[in-house]
C-alpha cells in the first residue's frame, strides 16, 4: 500500500516503486471531463453494465498490491472487481492523457503493465502530439494511430465511436 501522502499529493506504485504524479493541466482536465461524459452517456443510453471512473480512482492491478495506479479514465465491466477502495484487477478499458511529466510512464511502463494485467483496450491521448493511439489487446492484438480530429472506434463495444473533432479541445 502507498504511504500517507500530504493533502493534494498523488502517487502511483508500480512493481513496488513509487512514482509521484504532477497535477494535471487545464487542457488535460478538459479532455478527461469530455471523454468521461461521452462514455457515461453511451453506457446509460445502452443500459450497459460497465462503469466509467475518472482519476483519482484506485486500480490495483495485481493481488500482491505492489502495483497501484490511477488511470485518467477507467471503464470496468465486471462489478465483482469494484469495491469502496476502487478496482481490484484490470479494467476493461483504460485511457491515459499524456502530460510532459507522464510521457515515459504512459507510453512504456503502463503500456506493458496494462497489457499483461489483462486490460482489453488502452488509449493514449497525447494533446501535444495531436494523437490518439489505440491498443487493442484482445484477439490478434492491434495498434491504431489517430489524430484529435478523427472518429475513433471503441473496441470493447460494437457500435461506439468517439468523435474527437467535435470535442472542441
Question: What spans do the regions from the language model cover?
Answer:
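Gly/Pro/Ser/Thr-rich low-complexity, intrinsically disordered segments predominantly at protein N-termini
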Residues: 1-169
Amino acid at each position: 500500500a502507498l504511504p500517507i501522502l500530504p493533502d493534494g499529493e498523488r502517487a502511483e506504485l508500480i512493481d513496488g516503486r513509487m512514482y509521484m504524479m504532477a497535477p494535471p493541466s487545464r487542457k488535460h482536465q478538459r479532455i478527461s471531463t469530455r471523454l468521461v461524459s461521452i462514455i457515461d452517456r453511451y453506457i446509460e443510453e445502452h443500459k450497459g453494465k460497465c462503469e466509467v471512473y475518472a482519476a483519482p480512482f484506485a486500480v490495483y492491478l495485481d493481488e500482491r498490491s505492489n502495483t497501484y495506479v490511477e488511470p485518467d479514465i477507467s471503464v470496468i465491466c465486471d462489478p465483482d472487481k469494484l469495491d469502496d477502495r476502487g478496482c481490484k484487477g484490470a479494467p476493461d478499458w483504460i485511457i491515459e492523457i499524456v502530460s510532459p511529466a507522464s510521457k515515459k510512464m504512459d507510453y512504456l511502463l503502463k503500456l506493458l503493465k496494462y497489457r499483461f494485467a489483462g486490460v482489453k483496450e488502452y488509449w493514449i491521448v497525447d494533446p501535444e502530439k495531436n494523437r490518439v493511439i489505440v491498443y487493442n489487446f484482445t484477439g490478434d492484438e492491434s495498434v491504431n494511430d489517430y489524430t484529435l480530429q478523427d472518429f475513433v472506434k471503441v473496441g470493447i463495444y460494437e457500435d461506439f465511436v468517439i468523435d474527437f473533432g467535435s470535442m472542441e479541445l
